[in-house]
Curated annotation (Swiss-Prot):
Taxonomy of the source species: Eukaryota, Metazoa, Chordata, Craniata, Vertebrata
The organism of origin for this protein: Gallus gallus (Chicken)
Primary subcellular site in the record, as a coarse category: membrane
Location of this chain's protein in the cell: Membrane
Record protein name field: Toll-like receptor 2 type-1
Transmembrane segments: 598-618
Superkingdom in the source lineage: Eukaryota
């Protein structure tokens, strides 16, 4: 019993230890997996752990990490130790998680943090303690949470270096005085306060300067209170998603000077005719206001504004008016803005884009006396109404005009109307459909910049003014560029069909040119250097033929990398196939590909030298003789076989030199042909067939003779025909393998005097007896007896 009772606690402890070990073992691989999956940082120590389904900040953070992206996970809590080791963190992205709680000293080690994004989480309150250690923080995003206020005091009091702040959410309802204490300057402040219901006056006055203030507030009373505070600190005020329904209340009432707001932007706002008039009057009260902008707004009216009230108010200080994508619900009932003429005299910049403008009345256009910049891009302007919009004396000071993306069809007609703008310098009429253009056009005399891109022009003509310094004809159907523009400094030819660079002599002062996305295959050193003033050349995205000449120029031209825009990654070889897709700057062609002519010349030279050496060697070693004899032998072999014995006509064929003919014909012939029985001799003088080729006569005579007599002398070895006879006899020795040759030494001669190529004859002379003509008459009888015996053998 005692032992059993003692074993129970022991077993219990073992089970507990096993469970703890199992839990740790299961948790350890999870942490290792998180380290491997998440903390894979790049060279700048930026770690991306977004969209990984993490429930907590992963362990393993080190002091090397500078950027940590934990966005779009399921993190609910930031604990004290989570970021303790990440002391060099500059950017921390925690947006779109489920964070509802942050320990007070969670950011205690992040003294170097510059950007913190806690947006779109579940924070129900903000604590100044969180941000206390973040004295280097410049950008803070806390919008999209669930807090209803910023607390009783300022949560940002310690953020002395804060530059941009974005706050607010659908539950955000109150801003109290003191909420922004500690912040003196902000580059950008954005408040999402669609449901903001209470604003304590003066709450934003603690911020002395805000470069860009963005607010979204629906309640007009709250909006008015906020605006009155911002008029003294904001430089650029942007109001989003508001529907103005002011009547007698003035936005600037109770405001004291000086007012600082210089730019006012309405984004997504709705206006009526009634409120347009009141806003125009109210804005005149803001004497610092220089720029008014409306983006994606809706006008619920017909343009029936109270011009009398507007005219009675102060003169407007606005110099720039920009309207983009304005929707007029009663567009076809809209008035012609009569009466507004007196309000536009000080405008310097006017932009009405994407708003269906089809005409400006001439009488109104003449009142824009100070206007320098006019932008009507993406509207409904047409040629037959352009004369009304740009009539004589209209827009008298205009220097820049943008009529791009309208419905203009005739360049000649458009140019004629535009010529009324005598001070015009810059003109953009791109994205109209002009097509063919005439040879002559009338332009303003001071025009320097012309944009004709995307206008379906197939060919440029002298319609283009010669005064231009900048010309853009990109995205047309141009095959070439042949205009003479002596003052041109910038030329844009992107997305055309040009195969070569333009002639530099036509545009001698060109500084920058873009000819990307054309059909340019290459350009030479001469073409490139002909542009003396060229500083920038964009020839990227062409199909380059990487020839040896082109590559040699590219690789050796000094400073070309500083001139070519997009070099080297945007310059790709299209051919030859072996280097297609490679960067032009990295391609090296082989010696054979680059110096083919030189290599062929070298090969030809080597072949010539080889043949020359063969000729010299052949001459020295009688190669010509071997070839001629081989040919003759082959010719002889093609004839019928040697005649049988009954066809032998001669006992001997006599081969001798003409200089030895006296001895042969007067002595040897008499001795042999008058012997008993007589010998039949074949002599070339007597027995050769007339008209027959000499070589054939020699071959036939040798083959029809039983023996061949060679009368050797100094004259013999010098005779060409004697050599032929020796040659064929030499072949006969090989063919029949018998001794058919009889050598007679008419005078003493060394065996070495016989050419070395006649190895068989030399062998006969060296190994067998030959007959030598004796000068002694007593021995001559013995000579004849021996010769006759040799012939009979």
């Amino acid at each position: 019993m005692f032992n059993q009772s003692k074993q129970k606690p022991t077993m219990k402890l073992m089970w507990q230890a096993w469970l703890i070990y199992t839990a740790l073992a299961a948790h350890l691989p999870e942490e290792q997996a998180l380290r491997q999956a998440c903390l894979s940082c790049d060279a700048t120590q930026s770690c991306n752990c977004s969209f990984m389904g993490l429930d907590f900040i992963p362990p393993g953070l080190t002091g090397k990490i500078t950027v940590l992206n934990l966005a779009h996970n399921r993190i609910k809590l930031i604990r004290t130790h989570d970021l303790q080791k990440a002391v060099n963190l500059r950017t921390l992205l925690l947006q779109s998680n489920q964070i509802s709680s942050i320990d007070e000293d969670s950011f205690g080690s992040q003294g170097k943090l510059e950007l913190l994004d806690l947006s779109n989480n579940s924070l129900a309150h903000l604590s100044p303690v969180w941000f206390g250690p973040l004295f280097s923080l410049q950008h803070l995003r806390i919008q999209g949470n669930s807090y209803s206020d910023l607390g009783e005091s300022s949560p940002f009091s310690s953020l002395r270096n804060l530059s941009s702040l974005h706050l607010g959410n659908p539950q955000f309802s109150i801003i109290r005085q003191g909420n922004f204490e500690g912040i003196v300057f902000l580059n950008t402040l954005r408040i999402d306060g669609d449901n903001l219901s209470q604003y304590e006056p003066g709450s934003l006055k603690s911020i002395r300067k805000i470069n860009h203030m963005i607010i979204s507030i629906r309640r007009i009373d709250v909006f008015s209170a906020v605006i009155r505070d911002l008029l003294h600190s904001a430089i650029w005020l942007e109001v989003r998603e508001i529907k103005l329904d002011i009547e007698n209340e003035k936005l600037v009432q109770n405001s004291t000077l000086p007012l600082t707001i210089q730019k006012l932007t309405f984004t997504g706002a709705s206006f009526t005719d009634k409120y347009i008039s009141q806003i125009a009057v109210l804005l005149k009260e803001i004497r610092s206001l220089r720029e008014l902008e409306a983006i994606d707004c809706v006008l619920e009216g017909k343009g029936a504004w109270d011009m009398t009230e507007i005219a009675r108010s102060k003169q407007s200080s606005i110099e720039t008016l920009s309207i983009t994508n304005m929707t007029i619900l009663d567009f076809y009932l809209f008035f012609d803005l009569e009466g507004i003429e007196t309000q536009v005299g000080k405008l310097k910049r006017l932009s009405i884009a994407s708003s269906k403008v089809f005409m400006v009345p001439c009488r109104l256009a003449r009142y824009f006396s100070s206007l320098l910049y006019l932008d009507f891009h993406d509207n409904l302007l047409v040629n037959n109404r352009l004369g009304e919009t740009i009539c004589e004396d209209a827009w008298p000071s205009l220097q820049t005009l943008n009529l791009s993306k309208n419905s203009l069809k005739s360049l000649k007609q458009a140019a004629r109307y535009i010529s009324n703008l005598h001070k015009l310098i810059n003109l953009d009429i791109s994205e109209n459909n002009f097509g063919e253009i005439p040879d002559m056009c009338e332009w303003p005399e001071n025009l320097k910049y012309l944009n004709l891109s995307s206008t379906q022009i197939p060919k440029l003509t002298t319609c283009i003014p010669s005064t231009l310094e900048v010309l853009d004809v990109s995205a047309n159907n141009l095959q070439d560029f042949g205009l003479q523009l002596p003052f041109l400094k910038e030329l844009y030819l992107t997305k055309n069909h040009l195969k070569t660079l333009p002639e530099a002599t036509d545009i001698p002062n060109l500084v920058a040119m873009s000819i990307s996305r054309n059909k340019l295959n290459s350009f030479s050193k001469e073409e490139f250097e002909s542009f003396k003033q060229m500083e920038l050349l964009d020839a990227s995205a062409n199909n380059f033929i990487c020839s040896c000449e082109f590559l040699s120029f590219i690789h050796h031209e000094a400073g070309i990398a500083q001139v070519l825009v997009g070099w080297p990654e945007s310059y790709i070889c299209d051919s030859p196939l072996t280097v297609r897709g490679a960067q032009v700057g990295s391609v090296q062609l082989s010696l054979m590909e680059c110096h083919r002519s030189l290599l062929v010349s070298l090969i030809c030279t080597l072949v010539f030298l080889f043949i020359l050496i063969l000729v010299v060697v052949g001459y020295k070693y009688h190669a010509v003789w071997y070839m001629r004899m081989t040919w003759a032998w082959l010719q002889a072999k093609r004839k019928p076989k040697r005649a049988p014995t009954k066809d032998i006509c001669y006992d001997a064929f006599v081969s001798y030199s003409e200089n030895d003919s006296n001895w042969v014909e007067n002595i040897m012939v008499q001795q042999l042909e008058q012997a008993c029985p007589p010998f039949r001799l074949c002599l070339h003088k007597r027995d050769f067939v007339p008209g027959k080729w000499i070589v054939d006569n020699i071959i036939d005579s040798i083959e029809k003779s039983h023996k061949t007599l060679f009368v050797l002398s100094e004259h013999f070895v010098q005779s060409e025909w004697c050599k032929y006879e020796l040659d064929f006899s030499h072949f006969r020795l090989f063919d029949e393998n018998n001794d058919v040759a009889i050598l007679i030494l008419l005078e003493p001669i060394q065996s070495q005097a016989i050419p070395k190529r006649f190895c068989k004859l030399r062998k006969i002379m060296n190994t067998k007896t030959y007959l030598e003509w004796p000068p002694d008459e007593e021995q001559q009888q013995m000579f004849w007896e021996n010769l006759k015996a040799a012939l009979k053998s």
